[in-house]
Regions:
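Bacterial N-terminal signal peptides that target proteins for export
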Residues: 1-12
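Hydrophobic, glycine-enriched assembly/anchoring segments
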Residues: 8, 364-402
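C-terminal motif of bacterial Sec signal peptides marking the signal peptidase cleavage site
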Residues: 19-23
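N-terminal "mature-domain start" segment
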Residues: 25-134, 221-307, 335-342, 390-402
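Short Gly/Thr-rich strand-loop-strand
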Residues: 94-111, 138-141, 150-198, 320-366
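A short acidic-to-branched-hydrophobic micro-motif
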Residues: 116-156, 300-330
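Short, surface-exposed beta-strand/loop micro-motifs that present aromatic residues
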Residues: 130-134, 194-199, 297-304, 364-372
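Hydrophobic, ordered structural segments
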Residues: 147-150, 162, 195-200, 204-247
Length: 402
């Protein structure tokens, strides 16, 4: 299903925050033959004229590179199709954040070896229990982290030191070896059904944590091998930005963020949840059925998604893919949402309304999907008037941006 929530990490086309707006406004733009005149739409106070954000990253270049690294880390279903339940992913912009996915004693190592940035993703073969943030003991679960360092020497040293620190957490920890990856550093605690691993690869350190239902060291090593194979293949397809150029990364080079309807265009800066552009793996990592999500993205020709202040816009390869993406997200919305009539004056829109089985404290009451040529906008609100204005505004902004 598509998680449609008020809080937490942004998941597939999910809004985190919606500003409260009311009133009516006029719409800039021009009529295009064969299309509606967007100047006739009621867009409230939302700005809908063509726009571009400042491209300078300022102090946020590392964060932008971390967002790019969402495509450098493998999804769990790429490791094994049974691991279809995505448990999310996260940018690791600094050592303090990275130790959420490593032993706490690792932070000085990351600082001393000048960690540049990282990314983490996890998944399992079953969903987490309701209200829990960890898999059950009978689940197979995997966490993959890629950490970048200034050079290959720093990465190699960091891998050795991270392994030494991790294995030193308990006197019962023991080293393991991989025949397939003899350079990998593996360890486990006999009788405990999980394994940790580190592998230096070029300027990266790959960190793994694999949980299995049974404490079998040979089985755990085989799963570590499987994960390393998939992750190395994924990393080979990623082109890191040269360290000297990270500060010069553009915030919105394809003007995709500028196509997302927002109440206020001021004071936006790169943020992994509230102001970012992601590729396909980010959406897959949040899916409860990763293979199905991957098929949808492939079938629709999905390219990228931009998130800005609670709304989002996805771009697909050609206009035929936009309704495919809309229908796929509608179908995966889950039982808490029912179809509702969409605004008749906005072509192609489909909307959902929260039903009695939903949680209004966590889920928005209304959500609409707005296709326009190669783009799909997604907007949410708890107010019926606002959702209609916001839907119209998203359509108008997409039309005016071409």
């Amino acid at each position: 299903m598509v998680r449609i929530t008020r809080c937490g990490a942004v998941t597939a086309l999910v809004a985190l925050l919606v500003a409260g707006l009311s009133g009516c406004g006029s719409v800039a733009g021009t009529a295009v033959p064969g299309e509606i005149d967007v100047r006739t739409l009621d867009v409230g106070d939302f700005p809908v004229d063509r726009f571009s954000y400042p491209q300078e990253a300022g102090d946020h270049g590392v964060l932008l590179e971390g967002i790019r690294m969402s495509e450098a880390v493998v999804t769990s279903s790429q490791v094994d199709p049974s691991l279809k339940f995505g448990r999310g992913s996260k940018v690791l912009p600094d050592p303090a954040t990275a130790v959420d996915f490593l032993a706490n004693v690792s932070q000085p190592i990351l600082e001393n070896r000048r960690m540049v940035v990282g990314y983490a993703a996890s998944g399992a073969d079953q969903g987490d229990p309701e209200g829990q943030v960890r898999p059950t003991s009978d689940a197979t679960a995997i966490q993959v982290v890629a950490l970048r360092f200034p050079d290959t020497g720093s990465a190699a040293t960091a891998a050795e030191e991270l392994e030494a620190a991790d294995i030193g957490v308990s006197p019962d920890n023991r080293k393991l070896e991989s025949e397939k990856y003899p350079q990998a550093l593996l360890h486990w605690r006999p009788g405990i059904a999980n394994i940790g691993a580190f592998l230096a690869h070029e300027e990266f350190v790959i960190s793994l944590f694999v949980q299995r239902p049974a404490a079998d060291s040979a089985d755990l090593v085989s799963w570590a091998d499987r994960a390393l194979t998939a992750q190395l293949d994924q990393l080979a397809r990623f082109e890191p930005t040269p360290t000297a150029d990270i500060a010069d990364l553009a915030v919105d080079p394809e003007n995709l963020l500028a196509r997302v309807v927002v109440a206020d265009r001021e004071s936006h800066e790169p943020d992994p949840d509230q102001f970012a552009v992601y590729g396909r793996n980010y959406l897959i990592n949040s899916a409860d059925d990763q293979p199905a999500r991957a098929r949808l993205l492939d079938e629709s020709g999905f390219e990228r998604t931009a998130y800005a202040a609670g709304s989002s816009v996805a771009r697909v390869r050609d206009p035929a893919g936009a309704p495919v993406l809309v229908n796929g997200f509608i179908e995966s919305a889950g039982p808490a949402y029912d179809p509702m009539p969409a605004p008749e004056d906005v072509p192609g829109v489909k909307c959902l309304e929260l039903n009695s089985s939903g949680d209004p404290e966590r889920q928005y009451r209304y959500r609409c999907f707005v296709p326009y040529k190669r783009y799909v906008g997604v907007v949410s609100s708890d107010d019926e008037t606002e959702i209609r204005q916001k839907t119209a505004a998203q359509y108008a902004l997409l039309a005016n941006s071409l």
